[in-house]
Amino acid sequence: MGVPLHEQGDWIREVADLGYTDVWSSEADGADGFTPLALASVWAPSLRLGSAIVPAFTRGPATMAQCVAALADAAPGRVAFGIGTSSNVIVERWNDIPFEQPYQRTRDMVRFLRAAVAGAKVRETYETFTVDGFKLSQ
């Protein structure tokens, strides 16, 4: 078990003071991939923030766009967003979501996120999902 999130502030500040430039978060069986980065954005405003890796399956497209946009808004110019297929264990066994067409799902999510984060109102049928009229309010 790692350090609880509420106890990581001093550690994150020390990492920045020691000259590290980045902190990265993953998503598997602990905290989600975004919350630790949001906290780090406040605790150490000089650090770049990265997700390595957020699963393309475990959030719907609109929710994923909201998470990415919120973190980018909290830490302008400091976010590297990593997304990937994850695994059948995390997707199917832990989240009860069919782990089908993982490459296509990731590709479709990236295409959707590019449009949504750029401010487009997305009405699109992708190979693995459909979005009908989502627009981030920024």
Predicted segments with their positions:
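N-terminal beta1-alpha1-beta2 module of alpha/beta enzyme domains
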Residues: 1-52, 57
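Conserved N-terminal glycine/acidic-rich loop preference
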Residues: 12, 20, 57-63, 77, ...
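Short coil/turn segments at secondary-structure boundaries
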Residues: 28, 55-62, 97-101
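Glycine-rich loop at the start of a catalytic domain that most often binds anionic cofactors/ligands
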Residues: 36-46, 62-68, 96
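Internal, glycine-rich beta/alpha segment that forms the wall or movable "lid"
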Residues: 65-138
